[in-house]
Design a protein with these regions (language model features):
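Non-catalytic, solvent-exposed segments at the cell envelope interface
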Residues: 1-189
């Protein structure tokens, strides 16, 4: 979110400003230009939809590496080290906290949550009800995937669950970035 990168056709800026400037196409172009990542599709879910989806699944299980004490919506939260069962609201807070850890840790937690939601949906046969889920969550989700596209991706989803080694997560490590103060703002990125 705080990476200061080149936005094709827009100059240097924080990566999280790309979509707001020119939509998902600029964000995809920015990822490709700076990181070599080609984005084929996108899915964005709002907070209300995220909470509802996790609750519909009966919550998710997360292995928390270390104790986290922070705030979420101005309320104190604590996540002890070890296996945690999270409802939708707790999962959203777990994904968002970063004051007592770092933005890099937050990204790893978000990857954990995506994995846990995906795995739970597949093991509960949620993918079989993809058409119903697609329509019932439409108000919470922004995507360029049509229902037909989602249905065509279902065999891949089943494959991934049975072959988790085929999924690779990448996080930019601290040693691969430099701290920079944005001129005229004092913002550190």
């Amino acid at each position: 979110r705080d990476l200061f990168v080149y936005l094709p056709g827009h100059g240097m800026a924080r990566i999280n400003t790309a979509e707001g400037r020119a939509g998902t196409r600029l964000l995809a172009d920015t990822l490709r230009y700076n990181l070599g990542i080609t984005t084929h599709h996108y899915v964005r879910i709002n907070f209300e939809g995220f909470i509802s989806a996790v609750d519909t699944l009966g919550g998710i299980d997360i292995m928390n590496e270390r104790r986290i004490v922070d705030t979420c919506d101005l309320q104190p939260v604590e996540y002890p080290a070890g296996l945690q069962h999270l409802d939708g609201t707790s999962a959203l807070c777990y994904a968002r906290v970063r004051k007592t850890t770092s933005d890099f840790d937050r990204m790893r937690r978000q990857q954990q949550i995506i994995d846990a939601v995906f795995e739970k949906a597949v093991t509960l046969h949620g993918l079989a009800s993809a058409p119903e889920l697609y329509s019932s969550y439409a108000e919470y989700v922004d995507t360029d995937l049509t229902l037909d596209s989602v249905l065509q991706l279902l065999p891949l989803a089943f494959h991934v669950v049975n072959h988790p080694e085929d999924i690779h997560h990448y996080t930019i490590a601290h040693e691969h970035v430099q701290t920079h103060t944005v001129p005229d703002t004092g913002a550190m990125v």
